[in-house]
Amino acid sequence: MRVLHAADLHLDSAFAGLDDEKAALFRQESRDTLRRMVDWGNDHAADVMLLAGDLFDSDSLFSQTARTLALALARFRGKVFLAPGNHDFYAAGSSYDAVDWPENVHIFTARTPQTVLLPELNASVTGAAFTAAEEWQPFDGAAFSGGDAPIRLGILHGEVTRGESKYRAIAPSEIKKTDLTYLALGHVHRCGGVQWAGKTAYAYSGCLPGRGFDETGDKGFLFGEVTPEGVDMEFVPFALRRYQSVTADITEREPAEAVRQALEPDCGQDICRVLLTGARREELSLAALQAELAGLCAALELTDETYPEEDIWARCGEDSLRGLFLQELRERYDAAEEAEKDGILRAARFGLAALENRDL
């Protein structure tokens, strides 16, 4: 059977680094992401969609959000299973309780595991919900078995750890006890690929999309084949935008070109933060640089940690270790071929940094 596993959409959340207008636009894009994902799942003949919690960032939603979710999922041709997480926990009167969900959607509403049989797919799906913002009771793998179905899927929001957690500690040893075929997890915002605990495969799909500079890179979902013989799930990059956070060294370079080279290609839709470092030849105007880079990405945040470039040979010939060091390199520089001079200048900078006990 074909399984699509997603989590942590955090619909109606704030977006870091954006003004109110762009944040509203990106929130609407997040809602549209759900519709696009349903269409993608239909186009790729997904049988089951597993949504492992934190679909909403909180229960304080814009009026259209929960309805948009329900309408989108109604268009999915397969079965949908939702396991509410710590941000969107299930409670009487919550957003999950206030919407008329389509018949193809099953929401797990209890802390204790429940199993739904899918005889037409020779499968079962076992899941549980957060019913409060915290869940200190650790995961009990023995209680999470999917019965005797040839394909036993699980869906859960929580933190894989060998210690304690207020977000439902899930020990790998407990995952092993489930004897599930595949356990779809939510809570961790980075996809780490499929892991194994005994015969049970488990994975975090990561968040979709990223919402801040601590959630950089491609975001998407997992999709693939789950059979009694094995699991083949792959990450599908799907977010329209990425957060990027990079450093651009402007030493002996034009600042705008340094920024362009530091960012990943095709960053026109991305939200980018760039830390400018190195030696600047002249005073740096961030406003002017922003204007020069207008249109490079959807949003650009610049921070200046550069320092004025000094005459590297200014203390050449001084009666000191520094002066003798520079004198020797200057003589080499003057006698060098043009292609060799950049290397000598770099050696001088590294040497001065070492003598002055500072970073470059």
Regions found by a protein language model. Name each.
Residues 1-68, 139, 148, 349-360:
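N-terminal active-site segment of His-dependent metallophosphoesterases
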